Amino acid sequence: MSCSARLKTNLGMTSALSTHEVLNSNDTMCEILILLPPETIYKLILVSKRWLEIIASPCFRHTYLAKWKPNFELIGFFVCSSMYLGRRIDGTRRPRAEPSLPLLSTSSIGDEIESSGILKKLGYYIDSADGLLLCGRHPKAYYLWDPSTQKQQQLPRPRVHFEELCMSLISEDSPDQGFSYKVVRAECVAFPVNSTKVKVETFSSKTSTWSYSELICLEPLSLSPWTPGRVIKGVVYWHARGGKIAIYDSNSEEKRIDVIKLPKTYDYDEQVLGETDDGSLQYGWSNKSVMEVWKLEKVGNVLEWNLLFKVNFKAMWKMNQAVATRFSTWTKETQLLALFNQKSDLVYIRCDTQIFIYHTETKRVEVVQYQGRKSTLVWDFNKVVPYFRRTWPCSPLFENNAMMIDTPQCNASSAGSN
């Protein structure tokens, strides 16, 4: 189906279509629907099955999202612990009473996911992309879970063993083929001897197989294990030792990995990566007194870090005395928690067990209400990452003939959309 073609008469002139003809022409309906704002589009999927098929089609979705920025709904926050990953010298194992995949729910969808019991089957959190969730138990079992269909798929077992690694999930959206995904595993070597190679194994949903490759770097490189990276338009950003960021373009035929120094190289308490609204990499850090957020931009042919904003926590709470008094933030440490998805003017911060949103333009702080076992979490030893879902109707990612395992059903696909 072409989203731009117009119905024409035999003389090549656009015809005066009747209402009935317009409603029964997919091409004409596409041209009308693409002019409507997202909040209207989300309601129109309920009109008929045919309208849902048009709106959920890869062609229309790709064209529409090129015109209108996609909205993302916060489902909740996953609590990620690296204490039990890899081979532990001290033999530490997760206690039975401690969940492997805790979710601090902020939405009705998150509540249903938590109550469905599916999180108990997926292992540990690894990464997410547009709501698609990557979890597993290193180094053998990895699962993908789609919130739109409540289905999960187990990936084939990787062919290469990495003692320590970092992983990323890459979602792809083609106007012709629709959604697909890739999973990238990269080896992390603790003590490299001037190694300029990084071993990588990639799974593609298009081929349903793992492929092995070695990436070349122009300087010695050692990736940081078990740390969440960031994927922007197929480019993977991973933390590397020595205050660096490794950059790997998964779409490039060149088997290389680049490196850029972070704007600050000290050992800060918190370091997070994110994406700006124009598709650039964001880097944020915080210590006990301040936080900074930087943007990676290309100036000519050189990548440079530019400071977006710097916030003094003491001054911030002074401007938000009502919130500070309510949650007694004066006597507790404040930290940068995470960056918003494709936004530069909002960040998540944490003070004790409370999560807040800081608005950089208005300098205001608002509390984030969530459900979860906040009192039992060891916050200082866990990474808390936001879990977003793109609020857009889509066709199932996993086909019926894909490898599935039983999933408790919940009504997540129809609850709480923006």
UniProtKB/Swiss-Prot annotation:
Q: Where is the F-box domain?
A: 18-66
Disulphide-bonded residues: none
Q: Which InterPro entries match?
A: At3g26010-like_b-prop, F-box-assoc_interact_dom, F-box-like_dom_sf, SCF_F-box_component
User: What SUPFAM superfamilies does the database record attribute to this sequence?
Assistant: F-box domain
Q: Coiled-coil annotation: which residues?
A: none
NCBIfam families, alphabetized: F_box_assoc_1
Q: Could you tell me which PANTHER family the record lists for this protein? A: BNACNNG10540D PROTEIN, F-BOX DOMAIN-CONTAINING PROTEIN
Q: What is this protein called?
A: F-box protein At5g03970
Which lineage do the record's taxonomy fields give for this organism? Answer: Eukaryota, Viridiplantae, Streptophyta, Embryophyta, Tracheophyta
